[in-house]
Amino acid sequence: MNTVFNGKDFANKYYLMLKEFLKERNLRNKITLKVVLANDEPASKLYVSIKNRVAKEIGLNVEVIKLSANSVQSDILEVIDRENKNLSTDGIIVQLPLLKGMDLNSILNGIVSSKDVDGLSFVNLGKMILGDKKGFVPCTALAVLKILRDEGIKTSGKTVVVVGRSPLVGRPISILLSSKPHDATVIACHSKSIYLDVYLRQADIIISAVGKPKLIDKSMLCGKPYVIDIGISEIETDAGKILSGDTDFDNIKDCVKFITPVKGGIGPVTVLMLMFNTIKAHLINNNMFDVLDRLEKLVEV
């Protein structure tokens, strides 16, 4: 095994850089992110608390708008509409998953595109496809690009197998990596791909985001690829519940050049890119394009 990625150390380095960036430009505590939480799942509460802590550490204002678990879709849309009109709100995210029966697209597209810092609205996904840099790229996809760049993992001309096709993660990653300047040859697979092992053996880089525990083992690999594991699932063991990625980590770790673990892997970098997008939103909405240029050079993807 060559490298097990340390996402916490990676992200912490950039958190300090963003903190200094905001301080130097007198922007600390002048940028506001609103987080809408409408479920009682422990995992969602944990993710929100992490985003809240990181934002405050670097100097962003965060307000968590907690709705009742009995909330209906119109309650969330009402909050979104209010924050769309709130001039002091720079970014809005809705913590997923939504409650059963809610229309994900209606809620995500309720957020005005200039404040959609998760980058999941139709407008921002369209801008991503067209290469419009004023749009917001989904944070996990952006995190993948950041890891590849900073770790010196070349994509141009390489074969990248992306396992997962969700519009939130897998599909944006496939589109971005096949576009300039990344120029990869992307093979898009999913949990129903019959010949997944055949495709994986062709891969220079594997990116998996399907949420199926231990889907990928060493029998499916060839030539020590780079692996970014985005999937996360709970599995039962004799010792109780544990987290698992899409890869069988212990099984493949000696058969790869690079791998991201489930804990402390892609997660901290995804939060980092949410902070980046939130600062970017403030700068664009206030026509601070010279400062935006410096930000993009600081956190280059």
Curated annotation (Swiss-Prot):
Keywords, alphabetical: Amino-acid biosynthesis, Histidine biosynthesis, Hydrolase, Methionine biosynthesis, Multifunctional enzyme, NADP, One-carbon metabolism, Oxidoreductase, Purine biosynthesis
UniProt record, GO biological process: L-histidine biosynthetic process; methionine biosynthetic process; purine nucleotide biosynthetic process; tetrahydrofolate interconversion
Pathway: One-carbon metabolism; tetrahydrofolate interconversion
Pfam families: THF_DHG_CYH (PF00763), THF_DHG_CYH_C (PF02882)
Molecular function per GO: methenyltetrahydrofolate cyclohydrolase activity; methylenetetrahydrofolate dehydrogenase (NADP+) activity
Role summary: Catalyzes the oxidation of 5,10-methylenetetrahydrofolate to 5,10-methenyltetrahydrofolate and then the hydrolysis of 5,10-methenyltetrahydrofolate to 10-formyltetrahydrofolate.
Domain of life per record: Bacteria
Protein's organism: Borreliella afzelii (strain PKo) (Borrelia afzelii)
Subunit structure: Homodimer.
Binding of NADP(+), residues: 164-166, 191, 232
Family affiliation: Belongs to the tetrahydrofolate dehydrogenase/cyclohydrolase family.
Catalytic activity: (6R)-5,10-methylene-5,6,7,8-tetrahydrofolate + NADP(+) = (6R)-5,10-methenyltetrahydrofolate + NADPH; (6R)-5,10-methenyltetrahydrofolate + H2O = (6R)-10-formyltetrahydrofolate + H(+)
EC number(s) reported in the record: 1.5.1.5, 3.5.4.9
GO cellular component: cytosol
Protein name (database record): Bifunctional protein FolD
